[in-house]
Amino acid sequence: MNPDSDYPHLPNIKIHHPSSPRHSHHHSSSTPSAATPTPTAGARRKIGVAVDLSEESAFAVRWAVDHYIRPGDAVVILHVSPTSVLFGADWGPLPLQTPPPPSAATDPGAQPKPSQEDFDAFTSSKVADLAKPLKEAGFPHKIHIVKDHDMRERLCLETERLNLSAVIMGSRGFGAEKRGSDGKLGSVSDYCVHHCVCPVVVVRYPDDRDGPAPPGNVGATREAIVTVKSRRDDDDDDDEDHEAKIAAAASDHHEHIKDE
């Protein structure tokens, strides 16, 4: 690393290549030169923030710093990098790249296809950017990047493997007026709510339907709609679902909780 670089150093950025933890029994023959302290070791709570490189994820990180993470906590920024597709802000699949037209193969001016190494470097850089609010707030944290074709299952597997106390994830449009016909959350957040072993906090990114930001409050934003769900043996019951409207401005930490 260039010591004169302005880019912030973030500890323990990992990219795990096995498609599943079940196939990770083969260890590298290389031996680490020295054991380094884990930033999350000894924390009172280990909070995971699942990110997908979107503005919704950036909002969820900022919300977690302002309203959820407390002194004594440590944070794991968790990203599942898809093996064949990119996942957009709504946690839905988008093609990683479309096949070039036949003429592109012989066009000397055609852009070269990015390599897997390019994509890995881009992913690490974007996730590091998302973690900046944690560094600025002084919360101990690490970045954990894994690869899998099934984002939903892998998020739940990593949540259990990392022994997280709670997982926070961002989402756009999961409010009552935007839910599916069955009233469920989005596919990934809904899966995590019902399969993660710890509570899942889904932070809805506010949009124009939520109205303007509060007047006269410099730096204020519209309120975030937050759904908190805990997994229980009877987790199909509606009475587990609690919605909260929480002001996203850092200066206001009053929470208004209501049961559905």
UniProtKB/Swiss-Prot annotation:
Subcellular localization, as worded in the UniProt entry: Plastid, Chloroplast
- Targeting presequence: 1-33
Q: Where are the transmembrane segments?
A: none
Question: What GO molecular functions are on record for this protein?
Answer: ATP binding
| Bias (Basic and acidic residues) ranges | 251-260
Which terms under GO biological process does the entry name?
Answer: response to molecule of fungal origin
GO cellular component terms listed in the entry, alphabetical order: chloroplast; cytosol
- Disordered, as annotated region: 1-42, 92-118, 209-260
Can you tell which superkingdom this protein's organism belongs to?
Answer: Eukaryota
Q: Which InterPro entries match?
A: PHOS32/34, Rossmann-like_a/b/a_fold, Universal_stress_UspA, UspA
Q: Which residues carry this modification: Phosphoserine?
A: S20, S230
Renumbered to this chain, the Basic residues biased-composition regions fall at 14-28
PTM description = Phosphorylated by MAPK3 and MAPK6 after pathogenic elicitation (e.g. bacterial flg22, Phytophthora infestans zoospores and xylanase).
Does the keyword Nucleotide-binding belong to this entry? yes
List the biased-composition ranges (Low complexity): 29-41
Binding-site residues, ATP: 18, 80, 170-179, 187-189
Q: Which UniProt keywords apply?
A: ATP-binding, Chloroplast, Nucleotide-binding, Phosphoprotein, Plastid, Transit peptide
Q: Which family does it belong to?
A: Belongs to the universal stress protein A family.
Q: What else is known?
A: Can bind nickel.
Name the PANTHER family for this protein: OS01G0783500 PROTEIN, UNIVERSAL STRESS PROTEIN PHOS34
Record protein name field: Universal stress protein PHOS34
Source species of the chain = Arabidopsis thaliana (Mouse-ear cress)
